[in-house]
Amino acid sequence: MLVKFEIYFDGEFWCARGLDADIFTQGETLDELMSNLREAAELHFEETLNRGQSLHLLILSEMEVSHVPAFAAG
C-alpha cells in the first residue's frame, strides 16, 4: 500500500499531513518528524500490517528557489 504525505515547516515545527489517510504528526527536526511519521503510520495501518501487507510512504515536499543576481565585477 502506498500512502502519500506532504511535509512542510510551519515556522516552528516540521509537519507531515497525510494526503491519502487521516494522519498528522510533527517534530522539531526532520529526523524526529520521520520517526514520528513512521510510528503514526504503523499505528493507523496496524490491521493492514498485521495481515502481512507492506506499507510504503511517499514523502512530498515543496522547496522555494529564488533567483539570485550574478555578482557584477566592477
Regions found by a protein language model. Give the residues of each.
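Short aromatic-glycine-(Arg/Gly/Cys) micro-motifs in beta-strand/loop hairpins
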Residues: 8-20
